[in-house]
Amino acid sequence: MNQGTTSTNFDFLKEHDPLFVELAASAERAFASDPNTTLIKLRQFAEAIAQHLAARSGVEFDEQTSQADLLYRLNRELRFEPVVRELFHTLRIEGNKATHQFRTQHREAMDGLKIARALAIWFHRAFGKAGSSFKPGAFVPPKDPSAHQRQLQ
């Protein structure tokens, strides 16, 4: 994997699918210049995780299946804990807002990155080789260019 597709916050997902790391790393790289794109990429990240889970568990879907429908089917089959269901739905909803409203604050994108990381950690603990003993380390936030501006206010 080249330097452009690494992410200290998500590298542990390489074990599952390089696409997961690529999408998460793209979201992180976009953060400073385009927080809106960060949320769109994070929605795609959650979609990739959901599709992976569906394929793994035999839940049928195709390109016409909405993320909401896929999550409903997955929840019926896998019985997600409420917090996991909420992680998926928050990334879906915030990604939709970013796609259709065109404005995202850095604070919202940072929240999205933290939510995506929580989903990634759940996924890795549930399906990774390390299992529940996986220790992810601290979240490393990307630099927030609006933080300085907020301090001045």
Question: Model-found features: residue ranges?
Answer:
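Amphipathic alpha-helical interface elements
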Residues: 1-153
